[in-house]
Amino acid sequence: MPTTGPPPPLPGDRPLPSSFDNDEDFYNENGFQKIARKLKQEPLVPLGCVLTVAAFTGAYRAMRAGDHGRVNRMFRYRIAAQGFTILAMVAGGIYYSDDRHKEREMWKAKRDADEEEKRLKWIKELEARDEEDKLAKEIMDKRRQRAAAAAAKREGRAVEDKAAEGGAAAAQDAKSSSGLSWASAPGWFGGNKNEPDANAQTNTGDAEKPSEK
């Protein structure tokens, strides 16, 4: 993650000034750059390592050649080179102790800042997911409400249609029964005026038959 400067100090912790405060590359360097910076700060340490390796190589070659005097001399050089390397490391550690302590503090602060940023991003992502879930739930609830309203409307229409059909059937039945009642009334209201005379003639005929016998 690129940064433009040192991370902000933690609350209640005011760091001491350091030579790295204005060095932006210090916070953006990789492993190779860090090693190069260490070599530039303490050049005597790699020099002592090179001298130690050279003395050990010379002792090995003298041993292969059978020159015991040179072997002893090279081993003494190796011991001296190792002592020089250790001394350079100790002196560099003492000289750069404050900067190293500051470097560790800055590294811890940067690590804490990165962890805090990751935590905030994680919280924001959870909040965004929560909002998405709430929005999806609201949309589903609205869809269910619309579906329920549409179903209720369809049921209401079906009930109204059934009621209208029942009313029409009742009106048709009432009309049919009214027509039958008017048709069964005698006289001018729709009945047959000759029916009583026919009944009377039938009765008269029946009465005249015994007298003929």
Curated annotation (Swiss-Prot):
Q: Where in the cell is it found?
A: Mitochondrion membrane
Q: Which InterPro entries match?
A: Hypoxia_induced_domain (IPR007667), RCF1 (IPR050355)
Q: Where is the composition biased (Basic and acidic residues)?
A: 152-164
Q: Name one GO cellular component term.
A: mitochondrial membrane
Task: Report how it sits in the membrane.
Answer: Multi-pass membrane protein
Record-linked Pfam families: HIG_1_N (PF04588)
Q: Does the keyword Coiled coil apply?
A: yes
Where does this protein have coiled-coil stretches? Answer: 100-149
- One GO process term, biological-process aspect: mitochondrial respirasome assembly
| Region of interest (Disordered), ranges | 1-23, 142-213
* Bias kind Low complexity: ranges: 165-175
Q: Which residues cross the membrane?
A: 44-63, 75-97
The organism's superkingdom is given as: Eukaryota
What is its biological role? Cytochrome c oxidase subunit which plays a role in assembly of respiratory supercomplexes.
On assembly, the entry states: Associates with the respiratory chain complex III/complex IV supercomplex.
Family affiliation: Belongs to the RCF1 family.
PANTHER family with a match to the protein in the record = HIG1 DOMAIN FAMILY MEMBER 1A (PTHR12297:SF3), HYPOXIA-INDUCBILE GENE 1 HIG1 -RELATED (PTHR12297)
Q: What is this protein called?
A: Respiratory supercomplex factor 1, mitochondrial
